[in-house]
A protein has these predicted regions:
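Flexible, glycine/threonine- and acidic-rich loop/arm segments that mediate assembly and lattice contacts
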Residues: 1-325
Length: 325
């Protein structure tokens, strides 16, 4: 019997007591940020700051024993300024549903199930934002990797700093067919990734490679052919298929998207040094429910989960994008 209402699906007896999940998407970037400890809580503030040491001290000198030292100052430290964004998801239950979904008939808690769907829906949307460029939903979206790691590295700005003025905040962008010859496939993706990673190498390189389907499939084929297919066990056990290539954990950016949220293009990948990025959320609004509300003129209870913060970057100079188009 199709088309059951939520109250029917959660209250009727003699049913499988675990609903199938046709809501949760593949959310590899959000998972990786959490495991790296880059989802942080901040305590207030009008804006969110990230500091960066962006320039060399220009007064390093080699001198003779009696030579006069030239004294001077040049600015070496500055900051990025980010405006917070807000994302919410409401859950509503009315008095009739609460009355029906109780006692022996309530083998599934209706409110709990709705809250789980709401949480999954919220995380799906956050993954969409984190993989995006921050301009979606009329500019209300959180910033994403494409806000900071761009294909035109001298244009635009982020955090109030112009890429044209600060070369140290620019990521590396490699147009694969232009830099090399032909499209990227299993026969050449390893060497192309090595080239791209080496351009940003410093005490190790990017640890996460967020890849579109074409690049991800090519990497899997390349590693399988060489019998060198290894995986990040922690991500695999959490349900995120991956392949380790050139020292980076490459994960599929797309996969199944029940929400229909956009993901990065199939023929590109982002080499991300996670320590330079953070999802900074205000205390008390870290994807948490605010106090439950009761309508004054309706028999409904309302729970609203709120996230207020921003996806920030303290410099994309150690990350790269490689793309075929």
């Amino acid at each position: 019997m199709a088309g059951l209402s939520e109250i029917q699906a959660t209250t009727w007896e003699y049913r499988e007591k675990k609903p199938a999940d046709a809501v949760a998407d593949n959310i590899p970037l959000l998972f990786a940020m959490r495991k790296k400890g880059r989802v942080l809580t901040i305590n207030g503030g009008r804006v969110i700051w990230e500091d960066i040491k962006y320039a060399q001290n220009n007064y390093v000198q080699r001198i003779d024993p009696t030579e006069e030292i030239t004294l001077g100052y040049n600015q070496t430290i500055t900051g990025f300024e980010y405006s917070p964004k807000i994302i919410v998801v409401p859950v509503v239950v009315n008095a009739l549903e609460k009355a029906q979904n109780q006692g022996d008939a309530a083998f599934l808690d209706l409110l709990e199930q709705r809250n789980q769907v709401a949480e999954d829906s919220l995380m799906n949307n956050m993954e969409t934002d984190l993989q995006g460029d921050g301009v979606g939903f009329g500019g209300k979206a959180f910033a994403g990797v494409q806000s900071y790691i761009v294909t035109n590295t001298t244009a635009g700005s982020y955090g109030g700093l112009a890429r044209s003025a600060y070369s140290s905040i620019r990521n590396v962008a490699v147009n694969a067919p232009t830099t090399f010859t032909g499209s990227t496939d299993s026969s050449n993706i390893e060497s192309r990734l090595r080239y791209s990673k080496n351009l940003v190498l410093r005490n190790g390189g990017p640890e996460l490679c967020l890849a579109g389907a074409t690049y991800y499939n090519a990497a899997c084929d390349a590693m399988s052919a060489k019998q060198r297919f290894t995986q990040n066990q922690e991500m695999f056990e959490a349900g995120f298929d991956n392949v380790v290539i050139e020292g980076m954990t490459m994960v599929l950016a797309g996969g199944k998207s029940f929400s229909g949220g956009a993901r990065i293009a199939a023929d590109r990948c982002y080499g991300i040094r996670l320590e330079n990025f953070a999802l900074k959320m205000y205390k008390g609004f870290n994807f948490q429910p605010v106090p439950e509300r009761v309508s004054v003129n309706q028999l409904v209870d309302i729970s609203i989960t709120v996230g207020i913060g921003q996806f920030t970057c303290n410099g994309a100079g150690l990350s790269f994008v490689m793309h075929d188009s």
